[in-house]
Amino acid sequence: MNVLVINGYCLSVNSSANLCHLAYLQGFVDAGAHVSLLSIDPADYPTDLSMKIPDKIDCQYIRAISLYERLSRFKKGISSADEQNTEGTIAASSRSPHGLLQSIKNRIRTLYGPYGIDKAFYQKCKRFSCSKSFDLVISISHPPVSHLAAYMFLKTSRIKAKHWIQIWEDPWYSDVYGFNSQERVRLEEKRLLSLAEKVCYVSPLTLLNQQKLFPESAEKMFWMPLPAYYKNATPVHKTSGRNIYGYFGDYAPAARDLEPFYTAADKAGVEVNICGNPSNLFHSTDKIHIHPRLPLVELRPIENGTNVLVFLCNRQGGQIPGKIYQYSATEKTILFILDGTDDEQAVLKDYFGKFNRYVFCQNTVEDITRAIRQIESGDIGSVRNMPLDDFEPAKIVTSILEAGR
């Protein structure tokens, strides 16, 4: 099978979304497909050498850095120069180079429409064509412009393919942060969905919500878990006989409420590493260590020294942070903190509970404290700290192909 994967982002940038993108690519390779990738050229972006595209993939890159991004980098250069000459000056006004550039940037951003600066990928893709025929095109968002580019290619026959599946790791209009709740975004998402042959989401709750929001496309929608990117689980061990807890991921209050866990962990006196942004919401203590988002090469030693992984659900929206699938591939204890409405929590616990893999609790100080005590005592009932193979990339990709027929 010849598969073309389209993603309008630089896959060498360190992000949770990119780790999932790479896992999809690995899944297609492991499933025996001949995989081609069309993505953004890493030459224009800060890359993490640990973010490696799987071997055996034919990579085609688009130079798609936007004018907005170029001006942002130029502005940073001016700001750095200003910092060296601030003595005896006043704040920059709109007539300064800094203020003028910001004004130009704001005007330019409005020209990109609902896609924002990601629209540059679509614009540059208009120059691309491929003589190879594909059995399947997979467009993956984030960002949603991946789907727009895929449609343009297929409509104009710049790319020939038998089938097309859209994978939405996050919905657009109803994203968990609420940044895209504009009518023009809803209408464009509706249009993109109407163009697709099949649409795959990564959460049962997101599927239900999207089917209600876009009933005209409901029949073509299905859901499938994200593939796990961990390949070799690190050995589990206790340092000096104690557990070390780890929360790895962002925790902006609009999306995730980490404060109950922080408070419960502090009161319980357990050792914790929290790695992610924003890193200024909580202060470090003797046992709780706060870190910003780290490159993988710096994050790995901390992850390897952790034997209790903390997973926190989103406040609302039904989206499932992809880390739960990655953690499930390890032999480590997983503290699964439920959040959202009662109905959302019930759906998540019903699905994940069948694996007997997680120690569940609600996102309150009291219930998290109970779960921590349970873990510390070693009394976790029928929970088995064994790797699940249900989320292996090849299995997930095969299931997507079967559901997409």
Question: Where does each model-flagged region fall?
Answer:
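Conserved catalytic-core segment of nucleotide-activated headgroup transferases in glycan assembly
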Residues: 229-232, 238-283, 293-296
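A conserved catalytic-core segment of Leloir-type glycosyltransferases
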Residues: 43-116, 120
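Acidic anion/phosphate-binding donor-loop and adjacent secondary structure
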Residues: 49-50, 69-71, 177-180, 222-242
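Membrane-proximal helix-turn-helix segments that form the acceptor-binding/catalytic region
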Residues: 23, 127, 145-148, 166, ...
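Donor nucleotide-sugar binding/catalytic pocket of nucleotide-sugar-dependent glycosyltransferases
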Residues: 163, 194-234
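N-terminal subdomain of nucleotide-sugar transferases
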Residues: 1-68, 198, 259-268
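A charged, aromatic-enriched C-terminal amphipathic alpha-helix characteristic of glycosyltransferases
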Residues: 359-404
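Nucleotide-sugar-dependent
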Residues: 252-256, 297, 301, 309-328, ...
